[in-house]
Amino acid sequence: MQPLRLNSQGIQTQVIELIKPVTARRPPACKAFPACGSCHYQHWQETEVSVWKQTQVKAFLKRANVWPVQMRPLRTVPLNNRRRATFHLKRFADGIVAGFNEREGQQIVTPESCVVLHPDLSALLEKLRNFAAREFPIGSSVDAQVNGLDQGLCV
């Protein structure tokens, strides 16, 4: 590894030589990974993500002096099932940019499709894009928080 620069998560590095791949890694399902900031852990096996999340929760509870006697393993969300997202839309003179903020930045990444989102949320992004193209003045932008509830979408 070669250090490149400091960022909010530590030191950004570049791989110089891969000696042995880590078994916890998998190819990311999304073509926009890692530029898209929506899915940070797609390159991990689901069991590894679950263990990491559980470690984080236990550490938080310990700092709060609340230590569970027993804790069930945390579940991860399978592909096409995420029911919460923040969509970013911006109107330019030549059209709309709609999608997710890039990782570590403010540029909007517009993936062709999102393999993580529930199909209802993916369909809503296209509807929001069409709405913004008709209704937004040039230069305006909006962040749309969306939650998929059992009764429908809450925007």
Question: Residue ranges of each PLM-predicted region?
Answer:
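Accessory RNA-recognition modules of RNA-modification enzymes
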Residues: M1-V155
